[in-house]
Amino acid sequence: MSKTFWMICAAATFLTATMARAAEPACDRGCLEGFMNQYLDAMVAHDPSHLPVTPTVKFTEDDVALKLGDGLWGTASGRGVYREYFDDPEEGQVAFFGTLKENGHGIALALRLKIENRRISEAESVVVRSPRTFDMMEKAGAPDPVLLETVPQADRLSRTQLTAIANQYFEAIEQGNGKVAPFDADCNRFENGMRTSGALGCSAQLDTQVFNYISRIFPRRFLVVDSDRQVVFGFFMFNHRGDVLWVNSPGEGKHDMMGAAKRPFSVDVGEAFRIKDHKILKVEALMTALPYGAKSPFVPQE
């Protein structure tokens, strides 16, 4: 047969495959959460061999690049009760806050997966090995209902608007000014399972400059936008130089900085923001301390 014939056959095969991929339905909420559960179940079984992954799948744990199947994959021994999902069908990404057992001990996990052509191409995780965090999340049992509400289409903000509002939260922290970000009067913040916004609330607490020991929040990676529930999730690096020795809080005067902050360190934070009526209503975070200057393998290195 002629060379032209084989070229036509090859072109037809390529076109058919392309059309098949185009006709494949998008990975919706159920699909994304299915991938997440499949991943977590495989982790507990210590067996990634049957996971649908791309040939170049990238896996990190606490900002260290590992081979899929290493790290927590070798020590996870069961799933907990608390399970919270953030779904972004438009970008093919899904995030998770939840509890697990590691060799019988309770831990918490922030995890993000990227799905491309029905295969996992990225898996990024932060592990919180704290029995207290595990216990508090297990006691809660389930996410706050406000994080599970499907917001009417007419009341939804765009992806750009949601991300911009969440970013103002970090600006407010860096500036020590709660008025920089649009906080709802009922805003609460939970970190590693514990409410940390205190009696003052999200905005007024920042005005005390209690977070002035945080030198810089960078990079700020907004990765999952759950438009249906108006939630933004990402991973963010809090960097602390350790050179702030005291704080001058309005109305409280000068007082010493807590000892734990008087050293250089960074904190990798998986954080979610529920936005309602253009304001931050709820902040949830799981975080772990890292050496100062730590960088995510998912961020281009300088």
Segments and roles (model prediction):
Residues 21-302:
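C-terminal and inter-domain tail/linker signature
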